[in-house]
C-alpha cells in the first residue's frame, strides 16, 4: 500500500474504489490588521502552538499573529539512497497526526500555519542541493504541505554539516544554490508562503541571487533576522531584490521579555521598524498566560 498526494488529497494506490469524506469548513475570517505582518515561531518541544491563538488585538479582536510556524521538521539525507527527505520528530509528528485539534483551530481564526524546515546534523542543507535534488525535495515539500493542510514553509539553514568535498547529489554550499531551492519550491507551490530565517554575519545561511529572471526578493514572501532582541537595519540590502516590506529586522523571545529577562522590548523600536518601512515583526515561543 502506498500513498500519493494529488491536490491535497491522500489516497491509497491499491484501492479500486474511493470514498471521500468531505468536511465543510467555515469561511476563514480576515485577520489583516495593517502593513506589518506578525510571525511567531513555536518550538513545539516546549510550547503548544494553540497559545498563539489566544493573543488578539484589543480593539478589533483579530488574531495578533498572522503566521505561526511549527519549529521544526528537518531536512535529512538517506544514508543508503542518498536522497534528501523530510524528517519529523515525535512532537512534530503528533501535531500533524492531530491537525484537527492543533492546526485547524488556528487556521479557522485566519492564522496561517507553516512548517519550519531545519538542518539536522548531516550533509543535507538548503545551500548545497544539486538541481535535481532541489527539484525533488521541493516536490516532497509540496506533498507534505498538501497532505497536512499547511499554508507554507519557513527555511532555517542551521545545523547542517556542509562538506568541502560534497557527496553525490550535493554541491558546494552557496547562496545561489539556496536561491535555486526556493525557486523550485515556488514553481510547485505558487500560492503558499515561503519564508527565510537568517542570522549569520557573513550571510552564508541565506539565499541570494536570481533564478530564471526572478530574484530571491521576488521568490520569497518574507525573510527575518533571527538574532533575538537585536534590531539591525539595512540587512535586507544583502538579499537580491528584497524590499523592506518583506523583511523583519527585529525578533523577540516573548517568554524572556515577560519574565523580565530582557530590557530591549521597547515600543519606540517597534514604531521605528514600522516607520522605516519594514513589513515583518517576528516573535518566538509565547506562553499561554499572557
Label the model's feature ranges.
Residues 1-290:
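Secreted glycan hydrolases and related glycan-binding modules that recognize and/or cleave
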